[in-house]
């Protein structure tokens, strides 16, 4: 669907028996929120926006200055296919602003949109694609999630070892109904672990797609009596789940990642910027204490390095051709806020271009092998969430690109997460209640 005016939206609502309209947004951690507006009140909501209490949303506002307004992006309208066909449910993604129309520093969609505009001013077009991994778990007799995966399958397995085939099919078909373009789906390495890759799009559209994808997966899992988890490391002895982010740059219709990448080219400088700032970005790409259990094994990187093909590297250049040429950042996980994560990756690449950073030579070693990595003098990603917060708080780069209010609130909330886990009598139970059941 593609609509540009309020009247277009109202006509669609009337023609398609829509009774509820979700005004969707996310908190600073990327947890989706929404307010459902009845169709009879939609005209007013489109005209005036929808007011809400920002002090009740993680990382938004203090109670003494809590009023905020949701402004829908009309281009994002979509029907939710898993909801009833009688009295249908429609959804917008929204930007968040202050009641007087002033910008709100916690509007993560706005941050990503502004970052993309900076590339457009340079004559550059950014495309972003994602590869999202997740686990499917059984529920107990009371409908509560268990830690029992739905199968014993491994990488690329098929039925009967793969019990998720039909769910992935339903997920992909629902994605297509909602205007997304799934490309590949398969069983991943872990028992009950799955991956679905989505075709690249513009940065903002891709971030919206990540939010929608997680909605779809959870809804279809729930419909089948299962629990879908996007926790980075839900099972200690199984592979972690990543959200690999693929990026390409175009100028005058040419993919700058196609062919050999000169160290001082635009693509080379972009990669150099991402690598240079990767430690500072980690608190945003890997926002949970659990995120750091994933690094250094099962194809999740630990060292700041790049290579062609090598999956032990932080940045990989796949051996492909044409529009598929890209760089792949392998550290992010699906618990991240995709608007902040993608926006900051673009900001790091842009800083590399602005500073004319030169890409260092590739490292063609297996960095999952400690003996191989030893002596190379490579920087490592932060080992804990506390370290990631400290690195980010000391970052001059982040002070330059992030609104001060947003970064302060984000770091404060992250430190609260760390303190809550440290003080929990049973850390495993704390992680299950606050993360496994919710992420």
Regions found by a protein language model. Name each.
Residues 1-439:
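Glycine-rich, acidic/polar active-site loops that bind/position phosphate-bearing ligands
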């Amino acid at each position: 669907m593609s609509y540009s005016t309020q009247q277009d939206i109202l006509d669609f609502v009337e023609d398609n028996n829509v009774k509820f309209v979700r005004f969707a947004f996310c908190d600073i951690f990327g947890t989706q929120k929404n307010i459902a507006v009845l169709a009879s009140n939609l005209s007013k909501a489109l005209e005036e926006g929808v007011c809400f209490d920002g002090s009740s949303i993680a990382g938004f506002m203090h109670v003494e200055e809590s009023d905020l307004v949701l402004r829908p992006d009309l281009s994002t309208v979509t029907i939710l296919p898993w909801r009833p066909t009688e009295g249908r449910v429609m959804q917008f993604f929204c930007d968040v602003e202050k009641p007087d129309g002033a910008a709100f520093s916690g509007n993560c969609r706005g941050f990503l949109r502004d970052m993309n505009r900076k590339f457009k001013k340079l004559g550059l077009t950014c495309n972003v694609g994602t590869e999202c991994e997740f686990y499917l778990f059984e529920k107990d007799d009371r409908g509560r999630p268990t830690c029992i995966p739905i199968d014993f399958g491994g990488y690329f397995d098929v039925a009967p070892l793969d019990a998720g085939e039909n769910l992935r099919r339903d997920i992909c078909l629902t994605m297509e109904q909602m205007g997304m373009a799934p490309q590949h789906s398969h069983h991943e390495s872990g028992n009950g672990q799955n991956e679905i890759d989505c075709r690249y799009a513009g940065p903002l559209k891709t971030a919206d797609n990540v939010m929608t994808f997680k909605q779809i997966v959870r809804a279809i899992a729930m419909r089948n009596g299962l629990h879908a988890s996007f926790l980075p490391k839900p099972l200690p002895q199984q592979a972690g789940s990543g959200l690999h982010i693929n990026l390409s740059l175009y100028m005058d219709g040419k993919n700058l990642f196609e062919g050999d990448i000169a160290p001082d080219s635009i693509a080379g400088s972009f990669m150099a910027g991402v690598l240079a700032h990767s430690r500072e970005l980690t608190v945003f790409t890997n926002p949970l204490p659990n995120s750091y259990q994933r690094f250094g094994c099962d194809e999740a990187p630990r060292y700041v390095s790049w290579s062609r093909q090598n999956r032990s590297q932080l940045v990989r250049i796949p051996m492909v051709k044409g529009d598929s040429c890209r760089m792949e950042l392998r550290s992010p996980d699906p618990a991240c806020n995709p608007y902040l994560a993608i926006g900051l990756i673009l900001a790091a690449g842009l800083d590399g271009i602005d500073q004319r950073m030169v890409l260092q030579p590739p490292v063609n070693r297996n960095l999952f092998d400690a003996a191989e990595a030893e002596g190379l003098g490579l920087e490592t990603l932060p080992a804990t969430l506390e370290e990631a917060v400290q690195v980010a708080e000391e970052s001059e780069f982040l002070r330059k690109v992030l609104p001060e209010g947003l970064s302060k609130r984000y770091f404060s909330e992250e430190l609260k997460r760390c303190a809550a886990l440290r003080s929990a009598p049973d850390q495993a139970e704390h992680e299950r209640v606050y993360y496994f059941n919710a992420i």
